[in-house]
């Protein structure tokens, strides 16, 4: 009976949108898959964070090679957009911490920096002129740096922490958002990193040594591709079961709605049928920008960026982000086969 109840709640949530009247405000958290300019601010200001109340402007110079997915959502819906994502971020530096010389400190993480920055900004009406429970959606996309090279994939996590610790951190992020009055949550699950040129085995066209994994060829790349597949699918399964469990069974966020956006399946569908999504000649195994792992000199493809699934060996392209944004809006409105929404 428990499972039928949860399924019914999911169906009802999709139909009613759980009290979300209109997407007037979008607030995002994450890493380079979402960041527009926040890490750049740290770099350009000697490692200092943006002061509370400062709105960082939009940018089409992101890890996608253009606009990031959140900006596409804001442009298509007219939503007021506040983005706290930082390139290089993990969920918490207490689990995965990676130093970044350009800012003379570890990459700022979601729980340790992004959430406090968001909380500080809520006091500024210029940033949040109309933030209410029924008109604001909070989205999190985090995990690429938690699971990858220099993290769980290479056994670089803090002693005593596990992938379950990372998943628990994700739920804690939403605890903090809930405390500020947030009631509409979207969790974008792990992208198919195992298909990215960075983590794909060299025998199937994956990169060798890379700017993001300098000694990849010292590893059994087939073994590590399958290891990444295991990690992403296991985490996504934990998300699928964890969201309704915490929301409906444990009543962790009373009165909230929680959507799981299956980006993993969406991007695998693009990979399987690229001509449906990408410009010709569609390319889902190569990259638009190739950078030398030693000199960091980069060369761009002569083909259109819109024909590539991957901008570089780790980051989805601007076209991929545009696809993600289109489906994100559908997920929020309960109109996507890539989304499941639960309500408490």
Task: Indicate where each model-derived feature is located.
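Extracellular/periplasmic catalytic domains that process cell-envelope and extracellular macromolecules
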Residues: 19-22, 74-77, 128-134, 138, ...
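A structural motif corresponding to the C-terminal end of an alpha-helix
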Residues: 72-79, 173-186, 223-224, 230-260
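Conserved SGNH/GDSL esterase-like catalytic core that processes O-acyl groups on lipids
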Residues: 53-168
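Serine-esterase "nucleophile elbow" of acetyl-processing enzymes
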Residues: 17-93, 318, 337
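Mobile gating loops/cap/lid regions near enzyme active sites that modulate substrate access
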Residues: 192-226, 245, 252-315
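Structural recognition of the beta-strand scaffold that forms the well-ordered cores
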Residues: 25-29, 33-37, 80-85, 136-141, ...
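A solvent-exposed, charged loop/short amphipathic helix patch at secondary-structure junctions
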Residues: 42-57, 149-163, 202-226
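Fungal secretory targeting signals
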Residues: 1-20, 344
């Amino acid at each position: 009976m428990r499972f039928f109840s949860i399924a019914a709640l999911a169906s009802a949530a999709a139909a009613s949108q759980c009290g979300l009247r209109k997407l007037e405000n979008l607030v995002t958290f994450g890493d380079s898959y979402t960041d527009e300019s926040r890490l750049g601010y740290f770099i350009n200001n000697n490692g200092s964070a943006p002061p509370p109340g400062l709105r960082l402007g939009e940018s089409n110079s992101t890890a996608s090679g253009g606009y990031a997915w959140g900006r596409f959502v804001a442009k298509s819906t007219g939503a007021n957009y506040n983005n706290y994502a930082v390139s290089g971020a993990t969920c918490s530096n207490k689990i995965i911490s990676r130093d970044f010389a350009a800012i003379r400190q570890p990459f700022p993480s979601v729980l340790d920096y992004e959430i406090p920055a968001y909380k500080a900004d809520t006091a500024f009406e210029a940033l949040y002129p109309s933030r209410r429970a029924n008109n604001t959606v909070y989205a999190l996309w985090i995990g690429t740096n938690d699971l990858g090279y220099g993290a769980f994939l290479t056994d670089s996590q803090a002693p005593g922490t596990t992938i379950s610790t990372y998943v628990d951190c994700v739920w804690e992020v939403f605890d903090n958002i809930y405390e500020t009055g947030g009631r509409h949550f979207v969790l974008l699950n792990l992208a198919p990193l195992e298909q990215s040129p960075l983590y794909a085995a060299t025998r199937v066209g994956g990169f060798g040594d890379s700017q993001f994994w300098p000694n990849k060829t010292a590893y059994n790349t087939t073994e590590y591709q399958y290891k990444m597949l295991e990690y992403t699918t296991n985490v996504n399964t934990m998300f699928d079961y964890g969201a309704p469990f915490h929301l409906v069974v444990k009543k962790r966020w009373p009165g909230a709605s929680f959507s799981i956006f299956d980006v993993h399946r969406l991007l695998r569908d693009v990979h399987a049928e690229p001509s449906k999504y990408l410009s010709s000649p569609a390319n889902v195994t190569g990259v638009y920008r190739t950078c030398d792992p030693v000199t960091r000199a980069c060369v761009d493809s002569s083909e259109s960026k819109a024909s590539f699934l991957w901008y570089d060996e780790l980051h989805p392209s601007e076209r991929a982000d545009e696809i993600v944004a289109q489906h994100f809006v559908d997920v929020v409105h309960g109109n996507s086969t890539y989304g499941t929404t639960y309500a408490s």
